[in-house]
Regions:
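Cleavable N-terminal export/targeting peptides
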Residues: 1-30
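Short loop/turn motifs that connect adjacent beta-strands in outer-membrane beta-barrel proteins
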Residues: 25-31, 84, 128-135, 192-195
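Gram-negative (and chloroplast) outer-membrane scaffold detector with strong preference
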Residues: 40-42, 76-157, 232-245
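Short sequence motifs at beta-strands and strand-loop junctions characteristic
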Residues: 65-71, 113-118, 174-181, 229-233
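Predominantly the C-terminal beta-signal and adjacent terminal strand-loop region
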Residues: 96, 193-245
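Short glycine/proline- and aromatic-enriched beta-strand/turn motifs that initiate or cap beta-hairpins
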Residues: 26-76, 236, 242-244
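Solvent-exposed loop segments that connect transmembrane elements
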Residues: 47-63, 99-108, 150-173, 210-229
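Transmembrane beta-barrel strand/turn architecture of Gram-negative outer membrane proteins
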Residues: 120-122, 183-190
Length: 245
């Protein structure tokens, strides 16, 4: 005999309640998760006065530089050793930073660009249990930072060579020092279903680099050397989509 309509209505309602009462899929021991998303790097930057080390050592009075923000594609791989403890390897396409002259160098405009490589390994503690749909976390790790494709603008090259080359512009190159730095990380993961999740995190990296600029004339002879220190101290946000396997 067919069930009355009111019985079917109750069955449907109970099914909906049961579906929403199921434990939310989340991360647990042994899980591996790949996240792909957007890194935004906001630099809390500053710089020391540009110093001339040769010839006639001395400061370039009133000089400074600033480093702009950057965006890039981010990739992270996370392995859960327990339901709460995980290690994450953060990678990504190296972001390109733009440097602008400040103070007495402001008239030069953009003075250079560089790509930053900063793979990181972060230990994370996830709060809640493996059935939690929303899981905040804290993390602490380390990153190795180095730079490539360092390019100086023609205006800066002229500024650091022409005064020592009879007013004729030469060429200049720059080396940026590599370093290790700690990574402080907080964030949260929202589990959409058994496999997919959304992630958002903020990391702070206390970071600086020494810049050494070498000027040469047309014959390749070194005619000037300058140096400065740039503080970057970036805050890095990461908005991503994760897949568990």
């Amino acid at each position: 005999m067919p069930l009355p309509l009111r019985v079917w209505s109750k069955v449907a309602a109970l099914s909906v309640v049961a579906a929403f009462s199921l434990p939310a899929a989340a991360q647990s021991a042994g899980d591996n998760i790949v996240n792909v998303g957007w890194f935004h790097l906001y630099t809390d930057d500053s710089s020391q006065t540009l110093m001339r080390t040769s010839p006639s050592p001395g400061p370039v009075a009133g000089s400074s530089a600033s480093v702009g923000d950057a965006d890039t594609l981010g990739i992270a791989f996370t392995h859960f050793f327990t339901d709460n403890f995980a290690l994450t390897a953060d990678l990504g396409v190296p972001p390109k930073f733009h440097l602008d002259g400040g103070g007495t160098l402001a008239g030069l405009g953009e003075i250079g660009t560089a790509k930053q490589w900063s793979p990181a390994l972060i230990a994370k503690w996830y709060f809640g249990d493996k059935t939690s749909k929303l899981r905040p976390f804290v993390g602490l790790g380390a990153t190795r930072v180095w730079y490539s494709d360092v390019q100086l603008s023609s205006s800066l090259q002229r500024a650091v060579t022409a005064p020592y080359n009879g007013g004729v512009s030469g060429t200049a190159t720059a080396d940026l020092s590599s370093s290790w730095a700690p990574v402080y990380n907080v964030g949260l993961t929202y589990n959409i279903d058994e496999r997919w999740s959304l992630g958002f995190s903020v990391a702070y990296i206390p970071l600086d680099t020494d810049a050494d600029i070498t000027g040469r004339n047309a014959a390749g002879t070194v005619i000037s050397r300058h140096k400065t220190n740039l503080t970057l101290d970036p805050y890095v946000t990461f908005l991503s989509l994760g897949y568990k396997f």
